[in-house]
Amino acid sequence: MSKKNTLDDQDVSLFREAIAGARPIKQDTIRLHSPAIKQKAQIREIRETQQALHYFSDEYEPLLNQDGPVKYCRADVSTYEVKKLRRGDYIPDMMLDLHGLTQQQAKSELAALIEACRRQHIRCACVMHGHGKNILKQRIPLWLAQHPDVMAFHQAPKLWGGDAAILVLIEQNI
């Protein structure tokens, strides 16, 4: 059994006086402008990738050791970091597979990887260039050595791809 709340006539008339000037709401839904937000994020990501591509020049070739495994260490970074990369002390949190890509596509993907690592605070990444015709294997170390956010890199240990991959140590600007 439910009780009905009955209001006396005075309460009803007071309520009607209180809402006398009120109008019905035409629309009470909220429209989110998510397409604009997504579009801005995509534009920002494209711009960051293009800016990162600026660091990769095909004309400039830094002096890298041609003997033994490919390795590089920026002047302000301890060589102990390269040793830790070689031994596999750093575990890559992000992997990039460049098999089957052209040089331009690989350059763009490499720039995007470095930006993604910086945004997500990832310190070590693995770039797999494969064996193939050795074009990417020769170009990737030259591009990485030019980027200011790359602290060091070394040929990956067997666990992470051996001579078909490179472990990259990326600087985190906090």
Swiss-Prot record:
Subunit notes for this chain? Associates with collided ribosomes, but not with correctly translating polysomes.
List each coiled-coil range: none
UniProt lists the family membership as follows: Belongs to the SmrB family.
Q: What does this protein do?
A: Acts as a ribosome collision sensor. Detects stalled/collided disomes (pairs of ribosomes where the leading ribosome is stalled and a second ribosome has collided with it) and endonucleolytically cleaves mRNA at the 5' boundary of the stalled ribosome. Stalled/collided disomes form a new interface (primarily via the 30S subunits) that binds SmrB. Cleaved mRNA becomes available for tmRNA ligation, leading to ribosomal subunit dissociation and rescue of stalled ribosomes.
Protein name, entry field: Ribosome rescue factor SmrB
Organism superkingdom = Bacteria
Q: Which GO terms describe its biological process?
A: rescue of stalled ribosome
**Pfam families reported for this sequence:** Smr
Which EC number applies?
Answer: 3.1.-.-
Give the encoding gene's name.
smrB
Write one Gene Ontology MF term.
RNA endonuclease activity
